[in-house]
Design a protein with these regions (language model features):
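Polytopic alpha-helical membrane-helix bundles and their juxtamembrane interface segments
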Residues: 1-163
Length: 163
């Protein structure tokens, strides 16, 4: 539905449907994370460093969104929506990166990248080759999230990302 709203030039609807999608991603990733973690497990130094890096990336994304993108959005509901959406996609990225899966992490990062390009182009300045950048990163993100979340498996000759 979000892509359809975008093709109808309904940015608010597009953003709203994608925000709902991110809520579902967060629910999936958070549920998967908490099913795997033992309650009394302590974080190692390496895990603490990784968690700090994940949170830093999300905060950098939010800073860019709030300082560069949101001010360019029209005041009112669109600007509020952009801020909410940036927060949701950041939470989605954090929960994806906590899965200890390079496919989930890369999928989430590419999803954020595609949306960042869209938002930058719409509210800050034109991005050269934005159509290609968005389409390639968005569909690759969805594919990576799909192949990791499902039972879909590829043979050893096709395993390019073996982590």
């Amino acid at each position: 539905p979000g892509d359809h709203m975008g093709s109808c030039n309904n940015f608010l609807g597009q953003m709203g449907f994608f925000a709902v999608g991110h809520v579902f991603y967060v629910i999936y990733f958070a549920g998967r994370y908490f099913r795997r973690v033992e309650p009394d497990r302590k974080l190692t130094g390496k895990a603490k460093g990784y968690l700090a890096m994940v949170v830093f990336c999300a905060l950098a994304l939010l800073c860019a969104a709030f300082s560069k993108i949101a001010p360019g959005a029209p005041a009112g509901i669109i600007r509020i929506g952009v801020c909410i959406y940036a927060t949701l996609i950041s939470i989605m990225m954090i929960t994806a990166m906590l899965q200890r899966s390079s496919l989930f992490a890369l999928g989430a990062i590419l999803f954020v990248f595609s949306d960042f390009i869209l938002a930058w182009n719409k509210f800050v300045e034109p991005v050269p080759y934005r159509h290609y950048l968005v389409l390639v990163s968005y569909f690759l993100a969805q594919w990576l999230l799909f192949i990791r979340a499902t039972k879909f498996r590829v043979g050893p000759e096709m395993r390019l990302l073996r982590f």
